[in-house]
Design a protein with these regions (language model features):
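Catalytic pocket-lining loop regions of alpha/beta-barrel enzymes
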Residues: 22-149
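Mid-to-C-terminal alpha-helical segments outside catalytic/metal-binding sites
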Residues: 137-138, 142-149, 158-198
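Short Gly/Pro-enriched loop/turn and capping motifs at secondary-structure junctions
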Residues: 120-122, 154-157
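Glycine-rich phosphate-binding "P-loop"
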Residues: 8-27
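Short, glycine/acidic-enriched loop or turn micro-motifs at the edges of active sites
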Residues: 11, 77, 156
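Divalent metal-coordination and catalytic microenvironments
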Residues: 6, 39, 74, 115, ...
Length: 198
């Protein structure tokens, strides 16, 4: 009774092969697509870690299966932050930001798709409420607070921030929203996507 769905790390990009997790574009494989469709039979949701380059494949697949709740993990993989961090560049000024933002907006057009605000430490070891605010704002603008949920990505992100520091950033960002909108992102979005009573 505690089973809610499965999570797949399918992030892959030719732009940064060293940051790819799978050897091929699985969402293009017919067998993989058939297995994905089986999730509806078991009333299961699907978490996906992907990169912006894969948004078109994801949208094409998910549009055919509106009965399967989908959660996009780790902010839709803004891997451009990694290079920006190495150069000390401001993320909001990065040309690659628009490519990532386009992917976020494409995914948001599907009403059964939600997104998880998590995992930023993997892309920007020194991420903060200030330098990654554009990530939060883009995601909230695209999906709306009712389809944005918070995630800590612990213990992985413990390499970059303590749990309390991560929560402090979420609280600072959410502080710009109404009480109802904050409640949606803190519990409402996850409760609906994972069919929980929160």
């Amino acid at each position: 009774p505690g089973f809610r769905g499965i999570r797949h790390i399918g992030a892959r990009t030719q732009a940064a092969p060293e940051m790819s997790f799978v050897p091929m574009e699985l969402m293009q494989e017919s067998g993989w697509q058939q297995n994905f469709a089986l999730l509806a039979k078991y009333n299961a949701s699907f978490d996906l870690q992907l990169y912006p380059d894969q948004a078109d494949d994801a949208v094409a697949l998910f549009a055919k299966h509106s009965d399967i709740p989908v959660i996009i993990d780790h902010c839709a993989g803004p891997y451009f932050l990694f290079d920006a961090a190495k150069r000390g560049a401001v993320p909001a000024a990065e040309p690659a930001l628009s490519h990532w933002a386009d992917a976020v907006w494409k995914l948001s057009k599907l009403p059964h798709v939600s997104i998880k605000l998590s995992g930023l430490g993997m892309y920007h070891p020194n991420w903060s409420a200030q330098n990654c605010r554009v990530i939060f704002q883009t995601i909230v603008d695209a999906f709306g607070p009712s389809r944005v949920m918070l995630g800590s990505n612990f213990p992985v992100d413990k390499l970059f921030k303590s749990y309390s520091e991560v929560v402090d950033v979420w609280n600072e960002w959410l502080g710009a929203l109404s009480d109802h909108e904050q409640s949606e992102s803190r519990t409402g979005a996850a409760s609906r996507a994972y069919r929980l009573n929160l």
